[in-house]
Amino acid sequence: MNSRYCRRATSTLAFAAWLFVASQAFAADAIDAAIASERMPLDRQEDAWRKPAEVLRFLEVAPGHHVLDFYSGPGYYSELLSRVVGPTGSVVIYNNELYNQAAHHELLQRLRGKRLANAKRLNAPSNYIPLEPNSLDRVLFVQVYHDLYWQPGGSPEPLADAQRVLRRLHSALKPGGLVVVVDHIAKETPREELIRVATRLHRIDPHVVKADFDEAGFEFAGESSALRHDGDDYSVSVFNPSVRRRTDQFIYKFRKR
């Protein structure tokens, strides 16, 4: 290769590297601005134990992205995502009937006066979420993946079929799209015990999550230790006062294959 082509190739690589660094900095600035923005007092109180900056950076969310907040509940992360992705992006605030009933009034308050103009609520059965193919860049599960195996009182079945849910999300994600899952760690759990553990303890075995995503067509793309905590008792419910808001949590990232 002659020197002219070498210089051109080197310049191209340098420019690509600069673009990557610049885009990462742009995304980080958007995340910092979202966290520092005027938000609800209760949200701010939760920042210390939720560590949203670490979670959102790990999600690699950036302005212009289209994101789904799975089982958003009252919308703590929905609001942050809305502010990060900005007017050229969008956020789907997804809940099923049970989650919507529990969070309805808080979401009304959060969305009043079109506070989050780029966010929309979507309420639908978990196994049949109506999403357009290749419409999402990112999906976020925060302390809710175990609920796919949770068995509501009086129900003969768990809340959802994990494979149906993940395959729908796989279809809805663009090529290379990312999913981040944050959840409370359970001991290694046989498949036949998953429903019991999820229902009684609200935890899940991280190995099960990896296996579920692999089966649904995702590749494991890394993990963060930002929410790991020593001293958690995996045998008690996450709502037990001895561990509440101090549970040992995994943060996994998966990429659509």
Per-range role (PLM):
Residues 31-58, 62:
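Class I SAM-dependent methyltransferase Rossmann-like catalytic core
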Residues 64-73:
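Conserved class I S-adenosyl-L-methionine
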Residues 75-79:
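Glycine-rich SAM-binding Motif I of class I
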Residues 82-83, 156-175:
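A short glycine-rich, Lys/Arg-flanked "PGG" loop and its adjoining helix->strand segment in the class I
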Residues 103-129:
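S-adenosyl-L-methionine
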Residues 129-139, 143:
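A short acidic, Gly/Pro-enriched loop at the edge of an enzyme's catalytic core
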Residues 192-220:
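Conserved Class I S-adenosyl-L-methionine
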